[in-house]
A protein has these predicted regions:
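Phosphate-group recognition and catalysis centered on beta-loop-alpha active-site segments
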Residues: 1-275
């Protein structure tokens, strides 16, 4: 998306809340909107890597027995997990995609990229898959664990690394400042979670705008991309974050986000009088 710069955005858990999360249709939806879907990586009992946020099936799978729903993915064979439908009434019969299926999509189209959020899988196995498909430059590994990030940097130096920071505002700023003091660990991206402020005194989020602006400047000074994840947003909320200069987002509402960004830049493009 053009304007005063490029908007780089990620669809949280694939299709966000607009389509069933971590599904084939959700990933395609994000790609077709021009974004980068996020895939959470977990491993099954027989060693297959797949994209599912939770360590269990109970929340997302439809019509499964209670025992299967509460059993950790790491204790289930891939064939059993693959039989589960994680779609919805509108989008039924959606299977859990394997990581190799998603990487094959990247290999088939160099314009596609993906974010892999590390959950529970052998890093060496994930690295081997990426090498097999030759798609390292189309990938970002996301994690909150700097030790995981450092290890994966050794395994796959061409894969971009993103450290995500969650929690209360004080926790986020403390971790950010510690990262900045270490030159951001040599990693390319930092994501800050923007939780709602229950009081909403002058803007929606608990993290004050001055802090967001300060972190953005610190990241830019070192060539690091700062990404915001606003869990909820309306028009005025997103516009306020864009006004701070943030140009990278992770969102749960991809289509609404794209429409609002188009409006934001369209309005500002025509603010100056024509000559």
């Amino acid at each position: 998306m053009t304007g005063d710069g490029i908007i780089l955005w990620e669809a949280h858990r694939g299709g966000g809340y607009e389509l069933p999360e971590s599904t084939p249709v959700g990933f395609e939806y994000a790609w077709m909107l021009g974004g980068t879907p996020e895939a959470d990586v977990n491993a099954t009992a027989d060693g297959r890597l797949l994209s599912l946020h939770d360590g269990k099936l109970g929340r997302t799978a439809r019509e499964i027995d209670e025992e299967t729903g509460r059993t950790p993915i790491a204790e289930l064979p891939y064939a059993r997990v693959r039989r589960c439908d994680i779609g919805s009434d509108r989008y039924p019969e959606q299977v859990i995609p394997s990581i190799d299926e998603l990487l094959a999509k990247l290999r088939g189209d160099v314009r596609k990229e993906i974010v892999i959020d590390y959950k529970n899988a052998p890093l060496e196995q994930l690295s081997e898959l990426i090498a097999r498909f030759g798609v390292a430059k189309q990938l970002t590994l996301a994690t909150t664990d700097e030790a995981v990030a450092a290890r994966f940097r050794q395994l796959q130096p061409e894969v971009r690394i993103k450290i995500w920071l969650g929690g209360a505002p004080g926790e986020i700023t403390a971790r950010f400042d510690a990262l900045a003091a270490r030159e951001f660990g040599g990693f390319e991206q930092v994501q800050i979670h923007m939780n709602d402020d229950p009081e909403r005194k002058f803007w929606r989020y608990a993290l004050p705008p001055d802090e967001v602006r300060r972190m953005l400047a610190a990241a830019q000074a070192k060539g690091v991309l700062l990404q915001a994840l606003p869990w909820q947003f309306e028009r005025e909320d997103l516009f306020a974050v864009l006004d701070l200069g943030v140009r990278s987002f992770a969102v749960d509402y991809p289509n609404r986000f794209c429409l609002l960004c188009a409006e934001y830049f369209a309005v500002r493009t025509w603010e100056k009088p024509l000559r």
